[in-house]
């Protein structure tokens, strides 16, 4: 449990440090984005804590990924999208998306 807490605080502090450096170099009016991946409930850091330090949340939406027998159920995709919107309580960007298992052994769900 202590390791989880340490990791959470460390990731947040590192993100804050990076944002501060970028703002100093690029200017306070620059927009800082972080591209969050899925699997947020399995991660050992709080996405919303990191989101406090950036301007825009971005998300990689992969409803189908290689080796799956079937796509991620729509309600799980919706949960991920809701979670990203809630991280800053504002709209977010989809910066990567895949609608089929491109380059993997199972294709053609959608």
State each model region's role.
Residues 109-110:
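Short, electropositive alpha-helical surface patch
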């Amino acid at each position: 449990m202590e390791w989880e807490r340490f990791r959470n605080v460390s990731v947040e502090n590192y993100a804050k440090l990076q944002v501060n450096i970028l703002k100093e170099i690029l200017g306070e009016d620059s927009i800082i984005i972080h591209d969050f991946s899925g699997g947020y409930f399995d991660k050992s850091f709080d996405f919303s804590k990191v989101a406090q330090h950036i301007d825009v949340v971005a998300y990689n939406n992969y409803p189908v990924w290689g080796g799956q027998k079937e796509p991620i159920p729509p309600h799980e995709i919706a949960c991920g999208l809701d979670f990203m919107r809630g991280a800053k309580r504002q709209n977010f960007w989809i910066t990567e998306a895949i609608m089929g298992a491109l380059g993997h052994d199972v294709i053609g769900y959608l």
